[in-house]
Amino acid sequence: MVVAYLRVSTNKQHLENQQEEIKKFAAHRGLDIDKWYHDVVSGKVHSNDRKLGDLLESLQEGDCLIVTEVSRLSRTLIDIMNIINTCIQRKIVLHSTKEGYTFENNLN
């Protein structure tokens, strides 16, 4: 399953730019987005208290999570690192489109 996660901090910000960025990224890689999740909440709110927490719990080995930037996951480095580690440990591929990062368990 391929899942996209969008987050903005305020209603004045727009999710559309993130959505378009992810659509282009997915199309370029031949991926079809199965589900879209979005939050309108500060990145300082812990991931378990946002839709992101439910999303992370629902992902299974082999799934793919796409965000535009790792800062969409959280505003604290520790939370970002924990989320990335969780994905790697559970063999979930995490893509960050703007930064060009792909986090996956491929070092073995």
Identify the function of each model-found stretch.
Residues 1-108:
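Short, structured surface patches at the beginning of a domain
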